[in-house]
Amino acid sequence: MFYCREEELRTMNNRYKKGHFECVVIYGRRRVGKTALINEFCKGKPTVYFSALNASSQENLEALSKAIYTCQNPDSTSTPTYRSYEDALEAITGMAMEKRLVFVIDEYPYLAKAEKSISSRLQHIIDHSWQDSRIYLILCGSSMSFMEYQVLGYESPLYGRRTAQFKIQALTYREITEFHPELKAADQALLYGVTGGIPHYINKLDVESNLDEALLDNLFSTSSYLFEEPENLLKQELREPAIYNSVISAIAAGASRSNEISTKVGVESGICAKYLKVLLDLGILKKETPITEKPGKKTIYAIDDNFFRFWYRFVPRNMSVISAGRMRLIYEQAVKRFYPDYMGLVFEKMCQEYLLRYAKDLPILLSNVGQWWGTDYKTRREVQIDIVGAPVDGNEYLIGSCKYRNEKIGIEELELLRRYAAVFRQNGIFRYYIFSKGGFTQALLEAEMQGEVTLLTLEDLYR
């Protein structure tokens, strides 16, 4: 099934209908659905689909030759290899003389690593042959830093040749409801908290009717695909997976600043910074800075990928029980009772997405939404605000609190927000929002009726 990429597909098809040369760059982290989008687009269209190998230049030339010959002669059993990449690309030129042709190079970073001159060769043939052709070239890759700097960047030979680019992101918490619309809001939220909106993981989790059963069968089981996914992905992408595993484990255990992480891992801070950068490029980690402030001493690292965060939170500590096949016996006590705590950060992200993408009739035109933290110099205590919505212009801010627990939230939460808002901006104008899974007390509901605060439940986020 193909889900939730209708806008990208519509844009790609509109460009295809124009009939002239296109160079479309598609990139994003692994498992996010890039190949599924390309496959959907290519249906019913003459296509040479070449998926580059993490192998030598010659092996890639052989694979490219096979892709070209298979498109030309679907029933042929022999696939001769072109003498050079120039010959292979010229064959593409010849095929496009007769018809509109889609030419896909998937895993382009692998090809560029094996054949250093491929970007220059593509630049030359685009400029001298393909610019006036009917070729629809798609370059796709999972290494975001490579695609951004070596394909889209100013110093790339391909700079200025692209006609469109798509950075494919994980699906939002609302978009994933298309996979299992029968699930209630709490299970939809947990599904998002486990998979992070990655279609591949949602499919592998294979939820039928019960999410707990799906997790036990398809994640907390040594025979399941998802059980080994983080380690397999690190091995596939990185030369030193053990050290990267230690870095992620340190952050999962609570280390957030670079010096804390390097100390836990046991490597020098400069070396640790290189590992952190690679994990940032892969989309596994993220850097966070208090909203409205510039990166600096307050910058912290966090696990951005929900699936990695879930896995590192619950799998390593229960590895012996999982290996013994006894996870079902302790699931309630070892995993499920910690979901409210785990889902706290997930719920914050959902509330941020709601405000930026889905909320209607907001009192402020927002430019950005994020967290804020700092020191209350009166009490000398650290203050953290779950949600701060920064305005496009002016001094009016949205200040919010997110609570993912079953208890009702009371009026004291609004009072706390008011105190925190004064620490954030002394002369600001504030609109208060409180998000709660468990609802609100009567006193807080009355405060909403007086226009003092806007209250939203988990179910409201899906309406």
Give the predicted meaning of each segment.
Residues 291, 301-463:
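A cross-kingdom feature that marks ATP-driven nucleic-acid transaction machinery
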Residues 1-328, 332:
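Phosphate-binding site recognition
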